[in-house]
C-alpha cells in the first residue's frame, strides 16, 4: 500500500517546498519509490514536464529529488498570475482558461476531479507520495470547494503534518490558532507538526513545544533549523526572490530587473552559483547599476504590462545608456520580445487588443498568437557552436532584420536575434544558462576564464545534504513510519 503524507503550512512561505524536496530525497536515499504532488500551485516559475505540459518548477525540483521523471500529474492545477486579480489556469499541463479570483472560486469544484485523478495516477507503483499544500488551511474563507489543502486531504484521506515558521515570529499562536479555527473534520486529519526555520538554542523552545501540544493535542515531529543546503536550491517564487540578497566580490556584475510578472527567474540561478559573478536583482525604485557589464531581461507572464512597468521605473533609459557605454543585453522569452521595435496583441490575449512600442534595441517585431509553445527543446548555439538543452513556454512569433542573425537553432529552426553590433541578443529558450559549457563560454567572453561549476551536480549535492540535515533533526519514529 502506498504511504502518503501532506505538508500544510500555517501560512505562505513557511518552507513546505524545501521540506518536501528534502523528504523526497531522503526517501530515495533509503531506496523508496517516491513521488511529489501539489494539487494547486500559483507561480509564474513553470517547467515543462517530461511528459509534456506545464507544472510548477518547485514540483520539477521535487521530481529531481525523487529521481523520477517529472509529470503533469505532479501539479495538476497551476495558476499563473497575469494581473493583480486574474490568472491563467493550467490543468494537467494544458491551458484551461483564464479567471479572476471570484470566478476561480466557482471553478474549483470542477477541478477537483482532475486533481484526484492525477493523485491516483501518481500513487500507482509508488511506495510513498509526499503532498505539498498551498498557503494555509486556516484561510477558512476559501474552504468551500478547496482543492489545495484540507479539501483535498479529506477527499483523498491523506494525513497532514502542519508546518510553522518560527523565524517570522508568532509560531505558537499560528499553530494553536490554526487548531482553534479549523472545523473538526479538518482537525482530525492533522497528525502532528514541525517547527521550521529555527535559529539558536532549541532547548530554549522546550516550553513552547509543550504549550503547542497542550493546546492542540498534536505531537511535535521535530524542530528544523535554518537549512544550509536550502540556500543552494532555486527559490520557488517571487516572494522568496524579494528577499534574495547577494554580497559578492565577483568580477562580473550581471543585473536582472525584477519585473512585476517576472517568470522563470530560476534561469539565473546557475549564474548566481558562479564565484566570479555578482548577480544583482534590481527592485522597483532602484536604477540599473551603471557598473553592470551585462543586463538580462527575464521572462514575463505579461509582456506588454511589464514593458509599461519597465518604462515607469525608468529602466528603458537605463538600458539605452547601458548600451551606449558598451554594455551587453540579453533578453529571455518575454524579455526578448520587449527588446524589439513593437509588441502587438491583436486578439487581446494579455488584456485589451493593442500594439505597443518596444525598447528598440533589436530590429524585430512580435505578434502574440493564441497557440502556446510548451516543450523541452534541444538547441544549438550559433555564437559558440555547441549543443544546448532547455525549454520553451511562450505565446507569439517574432520576426525582423535582426532575426537574420539568430542566436540559436532549436530543433533545427532559427531562434532569437543578435543586433548588428553584437551587443544585444534575445532568445525564446529558457534554461540557457544551465548549460555549463555555454555559461563558461559566456563568462569567457567577458574575460572570466577560471572555469565554472557543474550546476546540475551542485543541485544534486544540495538535495543530498538537505535530506541528511532533515534526517538528523526530525523525529526518528515518525520518519521510520513514513519511509519505512
Curated annotation (Swiss-Prot):
Residues annotated as domain GATase cobBQ-type: 251-438
Keyword set includes RNA-binding: no
Active site as annotated: 333 (nucleophile), 430
Pathway in which the depicted protein is active: Cofactor biosynthesis; adenosylcobalamin biosynthesis
Keyword Thylakoid assigned: no
Keywords: Cobalamin biosynthesis, Glutamine amidotransferase
Pfam families: CbiA, GATase_3
InterPro entries: Class_I_gatase-like, CobQ/CobB/MinD/ParA_Nub-bd_dom, CobQ_GATase1, CobQ_N, CobQ_synth, GATase_3, P-loop_NTPase
GO molecular function: ABC-type vitamin B12 transporter activity; catalytic activity
Entry-linked CDD domains: CobQ_N (cd05389), GATase1_CobQ (cd01750)
One GO-annotated biological process of the protein: cobalamin biosynthetic process
Matching PANTHER family: COBYRIC ACID SYNTHASE, DETHIOBIOTIN SYNTHETASE
Reported function: Catalyzes amidations at positions B, D, E, and G on adenosylcobyrinic A,C-diamide. NH(2) groups are provided by glutamine, and one molecule of ATP is hydrogenolyzed for each amidation.
Family designation: Belongs to the CobB/CobQ family. CobQ subfamily.
Name listed for the protein in its UniProt record: Cobyric acid synthase
Species of origin: Allorhizobium ampelinum (strain ATCC BAA-846 / DSM 112012 / S4) (Agrobacterium vitis (strain S4))
